[in-house]
């Protein structure tokens, strides 16, 4: 469980006054003078906000002259307000003391619901990870942070690049990307119109905050039948100064990071940039890889209630892919590569970029009406050797969106918002024969792929009282797929349009300052991916594969008990039509629709602030995801196929029970130590839910099949240690994963036609790192 602390999210629409003073200093505990990290510090009159670092330091630029009030707050502490009188051009240094008190939900802010707001007012299952939680690991993959959250499955597939992330079972069919989850970077979708979310552009070391919303948010975002993952990057306002990092560890792991940020003296502008390079041999054969990433961000506030943000990201990745193994291969050597991966030289050489701007503008003098928008352009090139072919893609992407919001409409406690999103991915798709070694042989296809998504949404929020609120939202999505081919013998042109209306109704009751109860009914919508609809631009489109839709009914509660305990709970029931049941044919994802299925889940989380130096947290996830009406065929020993009914069986690839626990202690002011524990129950690998059995795969030898034994993945437990020592500008950190060297399967490839269900996790591995920081003078 991530410790919920006060997180600063600067509201883009906050009014700005004349700004020409600077306030900097430290936030400490009133009882022992210990630095308070991740505390929110702001000027109350104007809204400039920042967050303290690990040493409790902060800097606020653009403070107005004259009398002002500075407020500091953090979860578990009583807010402190200090009155100041600032002169033009003054740089004031102060110390702010916070006193432990009853916990309230107000300081926690999330933007994943399209509006910056307190967690106390979000009627959804939301978890937020702050900077300290993000930087506790190697900052290589999002799994390092997300796997401790309830309702989330997250694991590294091969070591440094491919991360399998799922919310409420969506990872069951994930192969080379995130499915069923809308992945956002600073609120703008990375997930493409076909529902595929790639994480290449996310540099975790440059992330300030990670927000996860569990459950369908299709009323706000496309491709979010299971939830939303929003990564907030750093800016020059909240991350002034420069850092250099170097990491090294087991399996040839190395990572280097450099960042720099700063803001103008008048507080109207700021910039931030980051670059990283990661390489590793990794723990499985044929899985070595490297990736370079870069990020540039600029923010400009030319006038009151006007904010313009520019950013660009790029990544260059080159990695080998070892493939999945059968049970016999796993028993012999779990770190081996699939023989076909070696022969065909499975891998991914992927270059991506994205650049654009976001604008927020107040439209009236009262601050009740505002408009915002974004425009981004990007692209990617991909060289992708797979069984029998090499896929070469050269795609472009255009994204544009606009939104208008009116608060207190008609003088009532009613907020209305309307918006539109357009997202178009298009480009060339060429296929070549792969006769071995990943070399380009004779051409197999030469065409184009395109997916254009259009979404229009409306949302109304009504505060019936100070305690009770209602939200009603409705979104229409249409995704148009186009495939063309100029290759002889292929289908010249094909089109398929998938659309859906997605409503959502929520109500929340805030029971005082310490708890929130909510109920929601929401519709979810998820479309198939390019490769799931058609194996190539000129191949027939699978007209039988339909979108997945669901109705989700949910009850939840979050809050605190006294000054020591925070809790979060949600229970849900989902009626699903067209569930994507995982199936892998020839190494490619070819899912099938289940006519109907139902999901029942329970997600619990608790954090105990036991002492000033010890935090304890735990999560529990129960997932009973069952197929109610589903029939599929299996290969028999005599090479014939037989239809089998799987009604009542569990969806493969999803553990029914998952438990995490964490203890974080600070024995010294500069030293933080952490102990993590993860446990999950057995996982079925095929639709039959057999703990062991045999499947038959095609063979060139009589009788035309070969038996391949398999077993379900047994329950497993993992333990991790981490530590960080901060001495002024020098930070030293270490991680020990899989402390006891447990042999386990990290990921399951469900219903593989070759019985290759298993991708092993690593044994014990160690990483060490050092970070050097330089802050502006006086900071």
Describe each region flagged by the PLM.
Residues 28-31, 39-42, 73-77, 87-135, ...:
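Short, acidic, small-residue-rich periplasmic hinge/interaction motif at the N-terminus
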Residues 93-96, 142, 164-166, 181-184, ...:
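N-terminal periplasmic accessory domains that precede
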Residues 126, 143-188:
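Extracytoplasmic beta-strand/coil segments of soluble accessory domains associated
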Residues 172, 181, 188-214:
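Short acidic/polar hinge/loop motifs at secondary-structure boundaries
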Residues 250-279, 284-322, 345-368, 410-411, ...:
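Transmembrane beta-barrel wall of Gram-negative outer-membrane proteins
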Residues 368-384, 510, 516-522, 547-631:
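Membrane-embedded beta-barrel scaffold of Gram-negative outer-membrane proteins
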Residues 465, 469-470, 478-479, 572-575, ...:
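Gram-negative outer-membrane beta-barrel transporters
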Residues 679-695, 724-779:
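C-terminal beta-signal and adjacent terminal beta-strands/loops
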């Amino acid at each position: 469980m991530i410790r919920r602390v006060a997180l600063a999210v600067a509201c883009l629409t906050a009014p700005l006054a004349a700004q020409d003073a600077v306030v900097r200093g430290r936030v400490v505990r009133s009882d022992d003078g210990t630095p308070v990290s991740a505390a929110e510090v702001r000027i109350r009159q104007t809204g400039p906000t920042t967050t303290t670092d690990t040493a409790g330091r902060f800097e606020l630029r653009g403070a107005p002259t004259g009398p002002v009030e500075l407020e500091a707050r953090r979860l578990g502490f009583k807010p402190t307000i200090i009155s100041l009188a600032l002169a033009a051009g003054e740089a004031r240094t102060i110390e702010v003391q916070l006193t432990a008190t009853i916990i309230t939900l107000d300081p926690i802010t999330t933007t994943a619901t399209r509006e910056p707001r307190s967690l106390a007012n979000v009627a959804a299952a939301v978890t937020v990870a702050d900077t300290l939680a993000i930087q506790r690991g190697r900052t290589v993959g999002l799994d390092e942070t997300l796997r401790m959250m309830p309702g989330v499955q997250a694991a590294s597939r091969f070591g440094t690049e491919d991360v399998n992330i799922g919310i409420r079972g969506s990872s069951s069919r994930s192969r080379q990307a995130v499915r069923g989850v809308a992945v956002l970077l600073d609120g703008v979708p990375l997930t493409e119109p076909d529902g595929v979310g790639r994480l290449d552009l996310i540099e975790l070391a440059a992330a300030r905050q990670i927000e996860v919303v569990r459950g369908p948010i299709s009323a706000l975002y496309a491709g979010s039948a299971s939830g939303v993952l929003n990564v907030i990057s750093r800016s020059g306002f909240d991350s002034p100064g420069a850092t250099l990092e170097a990491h090294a560890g087991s399996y040839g792991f190395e990572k280097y990071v450099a960042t720099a940020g700063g803001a103008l003296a008048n507080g109207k502008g700021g910039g931030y940039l980051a670059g990283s390079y990661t390489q590793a041999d990794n723990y499985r054969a044929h899985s070595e890889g490297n990736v370079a990433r870069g990020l540039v961000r600029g923010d400009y506030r030319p006038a009151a209630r006007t904010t313009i943000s520019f950013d660009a990201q790029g990544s260059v990745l080159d990695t080998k892919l070892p493939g999945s193994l059968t049970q016999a291969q796993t028993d012999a050597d779990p770190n081996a590569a699939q023989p076909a991966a070696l022969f065909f030289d499975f891998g991914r050489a992927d270059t991506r970029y994205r650049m654009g701007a976001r604008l927020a503008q107040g439209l009236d003098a009262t601050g009740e009406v505002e408009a915002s928008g974004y425009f981004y352009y990007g692209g990617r090139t991909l060289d992708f050797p797979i069984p029998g072919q090499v896929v070469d893609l050269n795609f472009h992407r255009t994204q544009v969106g606009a939104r208008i919001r009116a608060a207190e409409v008609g003088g009532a406690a009613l907020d209305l918002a309307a918006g539109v999103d357009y997202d178009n991915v298009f480009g060339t798709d060429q296929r070549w024969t792969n006769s071995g070694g990943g070399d380009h042989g004779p051409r197999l296809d030469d065409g184009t792929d395109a997916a254009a998504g259009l979404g229009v949404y409306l949302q109304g929020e009504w505060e019936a009282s100070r305690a009770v609120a209602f939200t009603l939202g409705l979104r229409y999505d249409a995704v148009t797929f186009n495939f063309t081919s100029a290759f002889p013998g292929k289908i010249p042109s094909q089109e398929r349009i998938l659309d859906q209306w997605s409503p959502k109704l929520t109500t929340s009751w805030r029971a005082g300052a310490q708890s929130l109860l909510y109920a929601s009914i929401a519709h979810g919508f998820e479309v198939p991916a390019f490769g799931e609809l058609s194996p190539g631009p000129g191949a027939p489109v699978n007209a039988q594969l339909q979108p997945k839709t669901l109705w989700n009914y949910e009850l939840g509660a979050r809050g605190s008990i006294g000054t020591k305990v925070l809790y979060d709970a949600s229970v849900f029931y989902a009626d699903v039509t067209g569930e994507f049941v995982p199936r892998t044919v020839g190494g490619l994802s070819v899912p099938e629709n289940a006519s109907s299925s139902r999901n029942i889940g329970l997600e619990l989380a608790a954090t105990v602030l036991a002492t000033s130096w010890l935090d304890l947290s735990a999560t529990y996830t129960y997932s009973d995801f069952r197929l109610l009406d589903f029939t599929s065929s299996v290969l028999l020993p005599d090479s014939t196929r037989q239809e089998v009914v799987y009604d009542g069986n569990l969806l493969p690839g999803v553990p029914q029970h998952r438990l995490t626990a964490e203890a974080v202690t600070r024995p010294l002011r500069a030293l933080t130590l952490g102990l993590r524990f993860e446990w999950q129950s057995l996982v079925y690998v095929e639709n039959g839910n057999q703990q062991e059995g045999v499947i038959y795969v095609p063979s060139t030898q009589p009788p035309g099949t070969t038996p391949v034994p398999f077993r379900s993945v047994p329950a497993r437990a993992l333990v991790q240690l981490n530590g960080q020592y901060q001495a002024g500008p020098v930070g030293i950190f270490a991680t020990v994963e899989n402390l006891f060297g447990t042999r386990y399967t990290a990921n399951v490839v469900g219903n593989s036609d070759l019985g290759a269900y298993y991708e092993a996790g690593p044994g014990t591995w160690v990483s060490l790192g050092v970070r050097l920081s330089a802050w502006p003078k006086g900071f």
